[in-house]
Amino acid sequence: MNALSGVATLNTAASSRVVQLSDTHLMCEPGGQLLGVDTDRSLAAVCRLVAAHGPIDALLLTGDLAGDEAEDAYGRLGEALVSLGAPSFWLPGNHDAIWSDDHPLKWHFKRTVRLPHWDILMLNTQHPGAVAGYLADSEIEALEQAVEHAQTTGRPLLVATHHPLMPVGCEWLDEIGAENAQAALQRLVPLSERAV
């Protein structure tokens, strides 16, 4: 089963406000902690901060949504995000479960988010049984198709992953980046302007 599928088309204004969140690590029970932090309270504080900056058009949640693959955590996550009034699109991280295609929250896991003037490609770097990331052949193929679409249409492309594709200057995070990131980065070379 593929974790990501489909296209979500958002008809927003000429400019789009997209917020990216990662590593919410919600636990099975409300009030669960990770490294001494109540992750539900942390998410609530982040949502208040996002709301204070005005309306947004979309949320990208880029992995480690749950801290222990607990299904209840995903339901609470969806409920917490409702207050922001924007659709949210999710990527799995190394701490997340992947569901069957008929799971009620599966609609959050889209391959592509299409905004009026640019596209967002969601790539799954989850490598079951490992902490470090890895891009399966299907993810590399999706990237190739998205790059070809960007070249054909001239639409800018943003690529979202959980595991970094390049070193970010944080030793422990750099150690768990996508193992085959170079394969992805090579596919991005044809795009003349890019930021990674």
Task: Name these PLM-found stretches.
Residues 1-76:
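N-terminal active-site segment of His-dependent metallophosphoesterases
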Residues 2-7, 44-46, 101-111, 143:
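Alpha-helical scaffolding within the catalytic cores
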Residues 15-28, 117-127, 158-162:
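Active-site-proximal beta-strand elements of phosphoester/diester hydrolases
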Residues 23, 59, 64, 77, ...:
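Divalent metal-coordination and catalytic microenvironments
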Residues 30, 61-82, 97-109, 133, ...:
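Metal-dependent catalytic neighborhoods of phosphoester/phosphodiester hydrolases
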Residues 32, 154-196:
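Active-site-proximal segments of metal-dependent phosphoesterases and phosphodiesterases across multiple
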Residues 88-99:
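A short, structured active-site edge motif that brings together acidic residues
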